[in-house]
Amino acid sequence: MEMMIKKRIKQVKKGDQDAFADIVDIYKDKIYQLCYRMLGNVHEAEDIAQEAFIRAYVNIDSFDINRKFSTWLYRIATNLTIDRIRKKKPDYYLDAEVAGTEGLTMYSQIVADGVLPEDAVVSLELSNTIQQKILKLPDKYRTVIVLKYIDELSLIEIGEILNIPVGTVKTRIHRGREALRKQLRDL
């Protein structure tokens, strides 16, 4: 996969826009999910994901072909998302949509293996509550929690994306989990 991406990047650097469209197709869902998990708003996540791809395209010449493209792209998206979070009004959370439920019905959440509807509702409510609590974490903790537990990235990848040492990543994950644990004690 990484070899194909590098091939496409070389084509993009030579002016082939279709090659970049292939790259977007590969990463669009992952980048959107990252933005959505950090912002909790569908429209803002779409805007930031689109902006991340635009920035990647415009700055593709600065990309070091010897590095991992996904890490570079995640860093762009993460930085843009953090910038958006910083610019938001403090009362944003009061008006935010419930994360993870855009366009989904309760019926679509029920698993076909015989899970009771009540259990599915409780699970969805818990998931939504956890997502809301994650959105209330400070930016530096929210970012690492989302990258580690939602996007399932390694500590090294998170460090590269955020341009911080792995030790700092571990500390932020620990402190983020502790902050999340304190928020969830009320349940």
UniProtKB/Swiss-Prot annotation:
Subunit structure: Interacts transiently with the RNA polymerase catalytic core formed by RpoA, RpoB, RpoC and RpoZ (2 alpha, 1 beta, 1 beta' and 1 omega subunit) to form the RNA polymerase holoenzyme that can initiate transcription. Forms a heterodimer with cognate anti-sigma factor RsiW, which prevents it from binding to the -10 and -35 promoter elements.
PROSITE patterns: SIGMA70_ECF
Region Sigma-70 factor domain-2, residue ranges: 3-95
Example of a GO biological process term: regulation of DNA-templated transcription
Intervals of motif Polymerase core binding: 47-50
Observed effect of gene inactivation: Alteration (reduction or loss for the most part) of expression of about 60 genes that are high-pH-inducible, including sigW and its anti-sigma factor rsiW.
Alphabetic keyword roster: DNA-binding, Sigma factor, Stress response, Transcription, Transcription regulation
GO MF annotation list: DNA binding; sigma factor activity
Annotated family: Belongs to the sigma-70 factor family. ECF subfamily.
Annotated TM spans: none
Entry-linked PANTHER family: RNA POLYMERASE ECF-TYPE SIGMA FACTO, RNA POLYMERASE SIGMA FACTOR SIGV
Residue ranges, annotated region (Sigma-70 factor domain-4): 125-187
Listed name of the protein: ECF RNA polymerase sigma factor SigW
Gene: sigW
Domain notes per entry: The sigma-70 factor domain-2 mediates sequence-specific interaction with the -10 element in promoter DNA, and plays an important role in melting the double-stranded DNA and the formation of the transcription bubble. Also mediates interaction with the RNA polymerase subunits RpoB and RpoC. The sigma-70 factor domain-4 contains a helix-turn-helix (H-T-H) motif that mediates interaction with the -35 element in promoter DNA. The domain also mediates interaction with the RNA polymerase subunit RpoA.
Keyword DNA-binding: yes
DNA-binding region: 166-184
